[in-house]
Design a protein with these regions (language model features):
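Generic anion/oxyanion-binding catalytic loop in active/binding sites
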Residues: 1, 46-49
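Short linear loop/turn motifs
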Residues: 30-33, 72-73
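C-terminal structural segments of small proteins and small subunits
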Residues: 48-73
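Amphipathic, hydrophobic secondary-structure cores in small proteins
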Residues: 21, 27, 31, 43-47, ...
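Short helix-start
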Residues: 35-44, 51
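N-terminal first-folded block
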Residues: 1-27, 35
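Glycine-rich, flexible loop/turn motifs
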Residues: 3, 42, 67
Length: 73
């Protein structure tokens, strides 16, 4: 399994937007991304840091349901 890459918060937001998420708000150092469909709404907070830690990135991937391959190097 390839390793997860190092991404900034803005890079993560761009990847999530490609997966159908929209930024609904940003306050302080966190942006909130949201994806709605007929069944449920998925909300994911993204820290807008220069480099997001690997554990935090793993949590964002798990919460969003985005494919891990989009974040691998």
């Amino acid at each position: 399994m390839p390793k997860l890459g190092h991404f900034s918060g803005s890079e993560i937001c761009k990847i999530l937007e490609q997966q159908g998420f929209q930024m609904v708000r940003q306050r302080g150092s966190h942006a909130v991304m949201q994806k709605r469909d007929d069944i449920a709404t998925v909300t994911v907070p993204v820290p807008m840091h220069r480099e997001v830690r690997i554990g935090t990135l793993s949590s964002i991937i798990r919460q969003s349901g985005a494919p891990r391959s989009a974040f691998e190097t």
